[in-house]
Amino acid sequence: MTNKWNFQTPTEEELRKRDTLAAEIGFSPIICLLLVQRGITTAEEARKFFKPNLNDLHDPFLMPDMEKAVKRLNRALGNKEKILVYGDYDVDGTTAVSLVFKYLRPYSSTLDYYIPDRYDEGYGISYKGINYAYENGVTLIISLDCGIKAIEKIEYAKEKGIDFIICDHHMPDDTLPDAVAVLDAKRVDSIYPYEHLSGCGVGFKFMQAFAKSNNFPFSELEKLLELTAVSIASDIVPITGENRILAYYGLKQLNSNPSLGLKGIIDICGLTGKDITISDIVFKIGPRINASGRMMNGKEAVDLLLAKDVESAREKSENINQYNDERRELDKKITDEANAIIDEFANMEDRKAIVVYNPGWHKGVIGIVASRLTEKYYRPAVVLTKSSELITGSARSVTGFDIYKAIENCRDLLENFGGHTYAAGLSLKEENLEAFTDRFLKLAADEIIPEQMTPQIDIDAVLDLKEINTKFMGELKRMNPFGPDNQKPVFCSLNVKDYGTSKLVGKELEHIKLELIDDKSNTRIHGIAFGMHEHSKHIKGMKPFNICYTIEENTYNGNTTLQLMVKDIKVDDI
């Protein structure tokens, strides 16, 4: 599928602000334009962006119900009540449980944690989990990354004498559960200044408020920011505002003095000694933590994150790595089977969304499969399987199509649903499958335009190769951490040429190792184009072509050079 390149064309106002900012901070015009496009237009804003400050974290008591939550927690600790820290089985949930449990452990000898089983209990608060709490004398449950829609289950817990403090970041319904406190910055009555916290981030704010109410030093809480960084990266929330501060300091902790559990994962990922980035969390650390909940039970991930000795951390990391290997095999198998179903669709070109179902598919990987189908076909995808008496599924979307809203418009056919704009989960009775499929496909057909089904690459700026040097890279690195709403900048260079030494590499010669030259400046630079072997014949013979790319540092044998990570090549027009 051919990519469409979208160039950001700066306005006259943006160019004026760029020039003013460049004069104030002494950075290159390109970097200053990138900052302006991200809403940073003054030297003071640039300073805060480049060097986030923990003092700029918002007052946690601005969040609705925070005072109630802290008061109830303090009472529970004072009365030595049994407290259960309850969280979802994904990375966000398990890191949130680990953070809250770690922080409260010194203040309670009756603290426990619980992760629901994906297959036996499903997502979120479960009756089984509440019964576990009741049977063990728990009188307060702190739920993390779940609970915002669990109205009936919270009522069930109240009947058993169990209070709930809900810490969630998903979209609430019009009616909130009748909990002691519902902490969610997305509440319609919220005046909290930042609504994009992860579930772990909400848990952190709760602990920040608890610490503040007791005049505890912030230093112990700061050590746990590594967990918020892992959750922010893995849950794909915007890395802006407060999340940028949390991610920035979390990465510092992860790189300088990680906990034993995360150190175990870092070692088994081959990241030891490397400067760990958001991308490393997204593609290496996060999937391994997630694999526990996908293949077995997410409690094992929490056990690892709470590990107290090196040997235990190493052993648990190896177990989780094994789960991840099994997950990869299963993921490939089910993706192949889903593609085979799609190949049988008579009118695939006309379809604006995909719904596939197989009762035998593994529930733990269907979210990954949905992502792969969306990437391949560039259409919203819903992947469904059978779980107990219900059909359950995961949905992923393309830019501009709110899949949560589409699924919400099918709510009368569903037993449960939840999620975000681009990712959601759902469950339904088998007799409603056909009606759901028809309605969802019609909603997509009515709303999605052809441009949304074309993969797009947003290009931040056009660069001459001569502009790419160590000074430029140093300025670019100051924009870390990159992620949603502060993506790693994508650049374009026009009319570059192969120096004559480019070659195919990889086990199946599927990648191109490039050596590029710019005739105008005689600048040479290396690049790698993964999976673009089909372009190799078009770029030979000093023919000019256009590339878009990100810039990386490549260290080999102690020598660091700059390298272009090529995202696309166009030989003719763009």
Descriptions of predicted regions:
Residues T2, P10-L140, K160-G161, A211-D438, ...:
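Hydrophobic helix-and-loop "lid/oligomerization" segment in the mid-to-C-terminal part
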Residues R75, M171-D184, L516-S521:
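Acidic-glycine-rich active-site phosphate/pyrophosphate-binding loop
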Residues G78-N79, S312-K316, Q322-V356, N409-I574:
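Mid-to-C-terminal polyanion-binding domains and interfaces
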Residues L99, P177-F216, L221-A233:
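Short alpha-helices
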Residues Y114, L144, I165-H169, L183-A185, ...:
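Generic beta-sheet signal
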Residues Y119-E121, A150, H170-T175, D189-S190, ...:
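Short gly/pro/ser/thr-enriched loop/turn and capping motifs at secondary-structure boundaries
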Residues A150-I151, D235:
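Intrinsically disordered, low-complexity regulatory tails of plant transcription factors
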Residues A157-I165:
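Hydrophobic or amphipathic alpha-helical targeting/insertion segments
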